[in-house]
Amino acid sequence: MKFTRLLRGSTTLVAVSALAPVLGCGGAAPEPAAPEMVDAEPVQTSRPSMSSRSEIGGMNEEKVQAAFQRASPRLSRCYEKGVERIPYLGGEIRFKVRVAEDGTARWAFVKDSTLGDRDTEACMLKVLKATRWPKPVGGEGLAENSFTFEPSSDERPPVPWTPDQLGTPYKKARPALESCRSQAGASQLKATLYIDTDGKPLSVGVSSADERGEDAAECVAGALREITFPSPGSYASKVSVDID
């Protein structure tokens, strides 16, 4: 099956404590063959002070970029599997990874995504969790990266929808979706759906504002898959909704 693989993004490296915020930036540059990550302007990170080294860790920028680069072919294979099921699958996905002091991933989650396929997202998370990361210095570290995937230009894109077009079925499902979120202790979630001509979801993807959202993702995706929405007409639609 013919499709275009466009992988682009930027790596954000920070010195962080367990509760420190992360600020990321994105960049873009297409790669015609095997997808490669292209970085935006270098992110400046400060060295931890003597008083804070017990709480925060610094990471070597070049080594973290290299780790994402090594993972990119496997991320692309996850996407290829998704395209086999959904030919017009595409969108941007942003990951956040917490790296333990031994260089393993303590956790990884989808921070934001318009990809719309949980199976593909889960496959990519598995790749990142298995990736060997550079060891942070002075504590644990965080890294973020955004990637954009685009299907072949031969594929007709789905019709864009707004949440209001999901109608009464979605309104009735909101309490169950909010229960998924609250039981996991997560903050805001976002779900992206492809809806077939019969109103049934073809696939559902879920992103979250924090790592606890991963515990809610399958619950949310499962609940949305059971709903029959209004028909989008003669072609599939795509929509994103916030769950908070």
Locate each region found by the language model.
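Bacterial N-terminal signal peptides that target proteins for export
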Residues: 2-18
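C-terminal motif of bacterial Sec signal peptides marking the signal peptidase cleavage site
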Residues: 21-24
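Charge-biased low-complexity segments
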Residues: 26-244
